[in-house]
Amino acid sequence: MKQAFKTVRRNRGAAGVDKISIDIFEANLQENLDALMRDLKTGRFRPKPLRRVHIPKGPRSKKTRPLGIPVVRDRVAQEILRRLLNPIFEPLFHDASKGFRPGRNCHQALEMAIEIHRLGYRYVLDADIMGFFDHLPHSVIMKAVARHVADGKVLDLIQRFLTAGVMEDGVFKPTTGGTPQGGVASPLLANIVLNHLDWQLDGAGYRFVRYADDFVVLCRTHQEAQEAHEFVQRVLEEDLELQLSPEKTHITTYGKGYEFLGFKLSSRSCRMRAKSEQKFKDKIRSLTVRKHNLDAKAVEKLNQVIRGTANYFATSFATVRWRFQKLDSWIRMRLRCMKRKRKNYNDNRKLRARYFRVKLGVLTLEEFCVGTGTHGNAHRVIPRNGATLTGVAR
């Protein structure tokens, strides 16, 4: 139970409806954990409603994504549940499922897609499940779990989490379907449900890669891709009571390229997609407002964004150096204007790149690229303390 709390603490997160933060919960940790354990053992545990918040899908987007924030106590209980279920289901998952699993990540999903393309699979069914986390029926979740879990207390606990409801603007709303984005156990439950689709695709002979509810089916011909579309639609509708989004699901080719996990993949390159680059720029803009001071705290926040972006996109299979150079130049322009407190200052070019890197300690995206390969750049990871750790992200 203490290990479960450590995981919750490491992931941080805001307080739930009870307004008890992680720090407040930790102040009486043993007492809180003992009470939670008693309630779980006796069956008296009742999850509190989630605090519903809506976050923008992007800085320039008017659309929002609903998140459900559990109270800290419930997060610990969900983490215990996740640790209990994971050893049962992990051996059952398909190898092409790369999301939210031990030892699996986005880069492995992208590498698998690239390797399949190299085998001659040039057509892509780029699939999107309509409102997956919001519309996933509770009955489908419970049926998928119950196939391998017979303990009534565990099943009852899952059911209680699913039906805990949400508080939005002070009003309670029951939850009759879906699993909340933001819930600790939600990614595992998603994998448990979609594992059925994985093995159905495998049994039909299709090659695919899935990361949570984001997946692509890779085919040799356009006709095969059309058949895959019909097959996926049928499995989702008949077995899982879900649907593909007609607007977001389409067939394309590796030559034309497609977007997957923040990248634009094509036969020519693997690079940041335009939306990912725009999100990065929007974050930098918010940190380089001219009226703000370019002090050590500002540099630290800036470096966090640069480091996170570089560590994700500067991989051994991605072509990013040329784009990173342009983005670094754009960042320096923002910093010069910030330093001079005005836009297009005539002599702000006098503040050279070396000034920002050496004197102020601002990282550059390009310095994470230390070598080039067939598809792009190996990279080094620069930890928060500034030490350099060399490695290849494979």
Question: What is the role of each PLM region?
Answer:
Residues 163, 239-301, 307-309:
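A conserved non-catalytic segment of reverse transcriptases
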Residues 285-349:
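Right-hand nucleic-acid polymerase module
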Residues 5, 19-57, 64:
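Phosphate/adenylate-binding "loop-and-lid" substructures adjacent to NTP/NAD/dNTP-binding pockets
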Residues 1-22, 83-96:
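Charged boundary/loop elements
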Residues 11-18, 59-61, 89-93, 122-123, ...:
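Short acidic (Asp/Glu) and glycine-rich catalytic loops that position anionic groups and cofactors
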Residues 67-84, 91:
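Hydrophobic alpha-helical hairpins/lids featuring a short glycine-rich hinge
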Residues 330-331, 339-394:
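Extended C-terminal regions of large enzymes
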Residues 39-54, 92-257:
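Conserved polymerase palm-domain catalytic core
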